[in-house]
Amino acid sequence: MGNWAVNEGLSIFVILVWLGLNVFLFINYYKVYDDGPKYNYTRKLLGSALALARAPAACLNFNCMLILLPVCRNLLSFLRGSSACCSTRIRRQLDRNLTFHKMVAWMIALHTAIHTIAHLFNVEWCVNARVGISDRYSIALSDIGDNENEEYLNFAREKIKNPEGGLYVAVTRLAGITGIVITLCLILIITSSTKTIRRSYFEVFWYTHHLFVIFFIGLAIHGAERIVRGQTAESLEEHNLDICADKIEEWGKIKECPVPKFAGNPPMTWKWIVGPMFLYLCERLVRFWRSQQKVVITKVVTHPFKTIELQMKKKGFKMEVGQYIFVKCPKVSKLEWHPFTLTSAPEEDFFSIHIRIVGDWTEGLFNACGCDKQEFQDAWKLPKIAVDGPFGTASEDVFSYEVVMLVGAGIGVTPFASILKSVWYKYCDNATSLKLKKIYFYWLCRDTHAFEWFADLLQLLETQMQERNNANFLSYNIYLTGWDESQANHFAVHHDEEKDVITGLKQKTLYGRPNWDNEFKTIASEHPNTTIGVFLCGPEALAETLSKQSISNSESGPRGVHFIFNKENF
């Protein structure tokens, strides 16, 4: 198993704390509504569905408070910057923000289902009591406060002639209307967040996610009508439950048992969510302010395999390696923002991104930049671009290790372009304070053309390290995962040439996929008693493989080899 705690210990601790708080809130509120004297008569009317509705409501408040925080990108970047003195293992938790966001969303979905189903039973019990087909106790409780301005218990205020009137009661009350609206919003948000829709129909995902505005407004006013009611404190003092609970016929007739009075709980949800909503509002204001700052496209480069490079300048823009930005092109869409990893280095006087053309928005940007035309495009014809960021990622920590493994799959190589460029600049400037001593770089790609735009950078690094007698600083392995028979024959013919036929590098391209178990064991033997950073930008399947290898090849004890796995998430 290796040292599992090295990679996952803190993450599991955070998750257990979160789950523990959910369990605590559920049990605590369940006991209040299932055992508390305040809700004794409410339980007589509604049964166990009362507690089963209110306990998940408390958990919903808690999780709806949390759901916005992981997507406050500027807040996370601030925390990452302010925690620079902390352990990389602590900062890694910030890089799992989207994973936590999804977990909280599923928890909200679970408690919404329980809350909704329980309240459907509550509506039925209330309506049955008003219709007169319930037990006499429930009917008597429902008759309390039938007149105006009296302190009633049953929210179904008028006697219903139609026994099927439950639906009517539900959809004519504020709680019912808002409950239906926010549940529909939640269903649309979750169903449009599947991997297939995010990748193939990002616009659908983006627009439906903004239903969260309606969701939170509905959530804030959901309890304003106070339909879940309990006995007032004054009534509990006057109306002794031990004496009066079984003497319903004598209520109001004997001094010891006055008619009980009821009141609804004041709305609480807004108190839970007002703080995160304010933070998120500030987040959006910062994003809007940044989006209004002028961005100049200085160069557009068309690379093979339908990839374009945008080089841009923006006043006051400062970046670190591996960071990402959000880009909006009003000519393509006035509302949509899309994330892209920065491929430039902090030492350069511009910032750049590489964009693979795979969807409607990227196709629109490709055409707006004139990349679909053969002739040269004048700078004044280039579209206006808005940029929000940069935002921090796990790759910022790459210089915190002496040894790192960088693994990129396809276009996922982009964050490592920034890192390798920065390394090259640091060596050009004779940087002596560089902690990083060894880079193992792996690039997996299925098409030969995809290597072309990155080969120049690797050649520069290869030459630079040889000139400085430090050729061992960078070990890179490029894997071609897709080829046909004619390509294989061509590669075989040119195998003995000094430079690789695909990349033009001295290091030959490998075919197939790495044997990760061998790679990790070899690196572990080369660097005993070392903490090694493993950085991935690639698919989930590869992330799972590398995470398992990092755990299984890490040794127990503080002086052993430790592989710390990091994955890009945005």
Swiss-Prot record:
A single Gene Ontology MF term assigned here is: superoxide-generating NAD(P)H oxidase activity
Which parts of the sequence belong to the FAD-binding FR-type domain? Answer: 287-397
List the glycosylation sites: N40
Gene Ontology BP terms: cellular response to cadmium ion; cellular response to ethanol; cellular response to L-glutamine; hydrogen peroxide biosynthetic process; hypoxia-inducible factor-1alpha signaling pathway; inflammatory response; innate immune response; monoatomic ion transmembrane transport
Q: Where in the cell is it found?
A: Cell membrane
At which residues is the cross-link Glycyl lysine isopeptide (Lys-Gly) (interchain with G-Cter in ubiquitin) found? K159, K161, K255, K294, K299, K306, K328, K334, K381, K506, K567
UniProt-annotated binding residues for FAD: R199, S200, W337, H338, P339, T341, H354, R356, W361, T362
Q: What is its EC number?
A: 1.6.3.-
Spans within the Cytoplasmic topological domain? 2-9, 73-95, 195-203, 286-570
Membrane topology classification:
Multi-pass membrane protein
Residues that bind NADPH, according to the entry?
A: I411, R446, T481, R513
Q: Which residues lie on this side of the membrane: Extracellular?
A: 37-46, 131-163, 223-267
Q: Which InterPro entries match?
A: Cyt_b245_heavy_chain, FAD-bd_8, FAD-bd_FR_type, Fe3_Rdtase_TM_dom, Fe_red_NAD-bd_6, FNR_nucleotide-bd, RBOH/FRE, Riboflavin_synthase-like_b-brl
**Where does the Ferric oxidoreductase domain lie?**
54-286
Where does this protein chiefly localize? membrane
Asked if the Swiss-Prot or TrEMBL record annotates the protein with the keyword Hydrolase, the reply is no
Q: Which reaction is this enzyme known to catalyze?
A: NADPH + 2 O2 = 2 superoxide + NADP(+) + H(+)
Q: Which GO terms describe its cellular component?
A: cytoplasm; dendrite; mitochondrion; monoatomic ion channel complex; NADPH oxidase complex; neuronal cell body; nuclear envelope; perinuclear endoplasmic reticulum
Transmembrane residue ranges: 10-36, 47-72, 96-130, 164-194, 204-222, 268-285
Task: List the keywords (alphabetical).
Answer: Cell membrane, Electron transport, FAD, Flavoprotein, Glycoprotein, Heme, Ion channel, Ion transport, Iron, Isopeptide bond, Membrane, Metal-binding, NADP, Oxidoreductase, Phosphoprotein, Transmembrane, Transmembrane helix, Transport, Ubl conjugation, Voltage-gated channel
Phenotype reported upon loss of the gene = Mutants have a very sever defect in controlling bacterial replication.
Q: Which cofactor does it need?
A: FAD
Binding site residues for heme b 2: H115, H222, R226, I227, M268
Please tell me where heme b 1 binds in this chain.
H101, W206, H209, Y280, R287
What does this protein do, in the record's words? Catalytic subunit of the phagocyte NADPH oxidase complex that mediates the transfer of electrons from cytosolic NADPH to O2 to produce the superoxide anion (O2(-)). In the activated complex, electrons are first transferred from NADPH to flavin adenine dinucleotide (FAD) and subsequently transferred via two heme molecules to molecular oxygen, producing superoxide through an outer-sphere reaction.
> What protein name does the entry list?
NADPH oxidase 2
Gene name per UniProt? Cybb
